[in-house]
Swiss-Prot record:
GO terms for molecular function: 5-methyltetrahydropteroyltriglutamate-homocysteine S-methyltransferase activity; zinc ion binding. Zn(2+) binds at H644, C646, E668, C729. L-homocysteine binds at I434, G435, S436, E487, D602. Its cofactor is Zn(2+). Transmembrane segments: none annotated. This is 5-methyltetrahydropteroyltriglutamate--homocysteine methyltransferase. PANTHER family: 5-METHYLTETRAHYDROPTEROYLTRIGLUTAMATE--HOMOCYSTEINE METHYLTRANSFERASE.
């Protein structure tokens, strides 16, 4: 039996972030909708061709999205919140953008949909909204249109569709509460209609993604799979697709389903392939996700060959990426500045396609020449194990010497809070921001000129100093209580720190999509991590010299740096996090010596790092909390430690949030209408909290009354004396006009509430 290969999805944004640029041009009114649609067509055609040329047998169609693939599925099903609907009930691309951003070139602005993390990745999806009795219909034919495009170009394709149960699982009920699973029978007819349309086009296989099957689902959700897939069978062959973890705990449900194939992630998952092979129906195709879609490391193809060869001819087999290549940069060949040895350790999306092709060829026709090719390809990643670039004896010794005293503050929170109140004398409802201010074209140009050698260090520092001075002056004028320096010197909250730590390397074009048009360029952790010199002290000290008000020192926490980087795979995540924590612990100490009394250690990714299965949570939370405390505990009692978290469901990890022992935690809550505070109320969270009062991901400016109402809602759950007032997140992606207006309204809302207390 010939083995075929396929990818589960491909990066959408383009090698030069063409999609991002086209989206933002269209949103700004600088280009037409047709010009935007043309960019999408060109990117899809290029990406299909690139995969085919790299040796991929079946290219995915339906993985492209204008904003997010879950949002695309919502539109496919006609699930558009009433506030975003067109007057005539039609659905167009601006409908999609209004749901994602809150506004579009046409239609009335309205609050954007909630956004949260896609499983345990750094990609974000738009949360589907459900209401009792809502109707579903095929409302958006993007998938079918793109299938027609790909077929017209002569590609062998495999359409990709987010499965119905995972779709419902990912959504939220709005308004009157009910069981969203009860909507299953309402959405299945749309899925049937889509599959029928695909069958008409001669499609043989459809990849139907059900990553919820790696979770510990409630029994009623597991029970729903059988009738759902009974309703979907018969029109095309269904490849039930899972990723991000193992499926062994749900195998009884899976193997009883009326599907024709199963894809499993054997990179992240730990399913025994021999047992899995034995337990599945003999006629099923088994697709093995052997090439890591979430990291940048070259695969050891010789090892994979040895592991997979016993399965050849046991059943129909495909080889695939572990998950969509969405999470990987596109092309390593674009990286012209990487050291040759380090570059030889990496593979980006196109190289991963070539890896699939090479491994498939070797398994289909194993001969000495092919095995030698596998060995030659795998040699660099094997040689890395003994590279001096990877190991630092001093770091390893310091890590081994950590004691329990190193991770505890000197005094408990209540005693620290008293010393901090005396030091800072802040008003009730203290106002602050999360850290960054708008990254203007001028700021980005300044950094780029410095990076490319067109600007010397002295003039660069002068330019950055001017932007910091401007940010401090703006905050003083607005009347904020605790200021920030604005982070003009930082391109990205993780990349900036990685650039100043040993053990990291950086790419030129290693962009991956975070959400919508937002792309990030994660650093790669290649070895042991240390801090050669202070990173943030110069700018924090300068900013503090400009004002009598406290200025926060701003650090990205160890768990977030780990989660938002491509990590090394030869040591545990715990080891990496604690190495980063030790490096940043020294930074906390240096900031204190420079007179900085409030230090924020951002951990927006803390929850995102959770394993997908609860059985594995406790071990992760223990070392994640310890890493944060190792970073922070060197601070003196009158130094106020803040932390910030994003997109979190906190109720199931409140013990660990409290265990961080941060003096103040700021969280994103505005999109969820403060419902996240219920977790803190139920837990009786003891420290101070800054619930975000407006959504910085939307350009809409909140009114004073809106902010005041949210703060009143917050005060019903948290004592007012422990509440701070702040936006949801950093302001780097916003413009100055809306930033000024929103912050002015926020400060005024806080002042009104203070006046009531007098």
């Amino acid at each position: 039996m010939t083995i075929l290969n396929h990818t589960l999805g491909f990066p959408r944004v383009g090698l030069k972030r063409e999609l991002k640029k086209a989206q933002e041009s269209y949103w700004a009114g600088n280009s037409t909708q047709e010009e935007l649609l043309n960019v999408g067509r060109e990117l899809r055609a290029r990406h299909w061709q690139q995969q085919q040329q790299a040796g991929v047998d079946l290219v995915p169609v339906g993985d492209f999205a204008w904003y997010d693939h879950v949002l695309t599925t919502s539109l496919l099903l006609g699930n558009v919140p009433e506030r975003h609907q067109n007057a005539d009930g039609s659905i167009d691309i601006d409908t999609l953008f209004r749901i994602g951003r809150g506004r579009a070139p046409t239609g009335k602005p309205a609050a954007a949909a909630e956004m949260t993390k896609w499983f345990n990745t750094n990609y974000h999806y738009m949360v589907p909204e459900f209401q009792q009795g809502q109707q579903f219909k095929l409302g958006w034919t993007q998938l079918l249109d793109e299938v027609d495009e790909a077929l017209a170009l002569g590609h062998k394709i495999k359409p990709v569709l987010l499965g119905p149960i995972t779709y419902l699982w990912l959504g939220k009920v709005k308004g009157e509460q009910f069981d969203r699973l009860s909507l299953l029978n309402d959405i299945l007819p749309v899925y049937q209609q889509v599959l029928a349309e695909l069958a008409k086009r001669g499609i043989e296989w459809v990849q139907i993604d059900e990553p919820a099957l790696v979770l510990e689902l409630p029994q009623e959700w597991l029970d729903a799979y059988q009738p759902a897939y009974q309703a979907l069978q018969g029109q095309v062959k269904l490849l039930l697709t899972t990723y991000f973890d193992s499926i062994g705990h749900n195998i009884d449900t899976i193997r009883a389903l009326p599907v024709q194939g199963l894809h499993v992630d054997v990179v992240t998952g730990h399913d025994d392939l021999a047992v899995l092979n034995k337990n599945l129906p003999k006629e099923w195709l088994l697709s093995l996700g052997v090439i890591n879609g979430r990291n940048v490391w070259r695969a050891d193809l010789s090892s994979w060959f040895e592991r997979l060869q016993p399965l050849v001819n046991s059943r129909p087999l495909w080889l695939g990426s572990s998950c969509s290549l969405l999470h990987s940069p596109i092309d390593l060949n674009e990286e012209t500045r990487l050291d040759a040895e380090v570059k030889s350790w990496f593979a980006f999306a196109l190289q991963k396609c070539a890896e699939l092709a090479l491994l498939t060829q070797a398994l289909n026709a194993p001969n000495d020449a092919k095995l030698a090719e596998l060995a030659a390809y795998s040699a660099p990643i094997r040689a890395r194990r003994s590279s001096s670039r990877v190991h630092n004896a001093q770091v390893e010794q310091r890590l081994a010497a950590i004691t329990s005293q190193d991770i505890e503050r000197q005094l408990p929170y209540e005693a620290r809070a008293e010393t901090q109140r005396k030091r800072f004398n802040l008003p009730a409802w203290p106002t602050t921001t999360i850290g960054s201010f708008p990254q203007t074209t001028e700021i980005r140009g300044l950094r780029l000129d410095f990076k490319q050698g067109r600007l010397d260090g002295k003039n660069y520092r002068t330019g950055i100093s001017e932007h910091i001075k401007h940010a401090i002056a703006e905050q003083e004028r607005l009347g904020l209580d605790v200021l920030v320096h604005g982070e003009a010197e930082r391109n990205d909250m993780v990349e900036y720190f990685g650039e100043h730590l040993d053990g990291f390397v950086f790419t030129q074009n290693g962009w991956v999509q975070s959400y919508g048009s937002r792309c990030v360029k994660p650093p790669v952790i290649i070895g042991d991590i240390s801090r050669p010199e202070a990173i943030t002290v110069e700018w924090a000290k300068y900013a503090q010299s400009l004002t009598e008000k406290p200025v926060k020192g701003m650090l990205t926490g160890p768990v977030t740096i780990l989660c938002w980087s491509f990590p090394r795979e030869d040591v545990s995540r715990e080891t990496i996090a604690k190495q980063i924590a030790l490096a940043l612990r020294d930074e906390v100490e240096d900031l204190e010596k420079a007179g900085i009394g409030i230090i924020q250690i951002d951990e927006p990714a803390l929850r995102e790092g959770l394993p997908l299965r609860r059985a594995d949570w406790q071990a992760y939370l223990q070392w994640a909390v310890d890493a944060f405390k190792l970073n922070a505990a060197v601070a003196q009692n009158d130094t106020q430690i803040h932390t910030h978290m994003c997109y979190c469901e906190f109720n199931d990890i409140m013990d660990s949030i409290a265990a961080l022992d941060a003096d103040v935690i700021t969280i994103e809550t505005s999109r969820s209408d403060m419902e996240l505070l219920e977790s803190f109320e139920d837990f009786a969270y003891p420290n101070e909290i800054g619930p975000g009062v407006y959504d910085i991901h939307s350009p809409n400016v909140p009114s004073v009354e809106w902010i005041e109402a949210l703060l009143r809602k917050a005060a019903q759950r948290i004592p007012a004396e422990r509440l701070w007032v702040n936006p949801d997140c950093g302001l780097k992606t916003r413009g100055w006009p809306e930033t000024r207006q929103a912050l002015a309204n926020m400060v005024l809302a806080a002042q009104r509430l203070r006046e009531e207390q007098v």
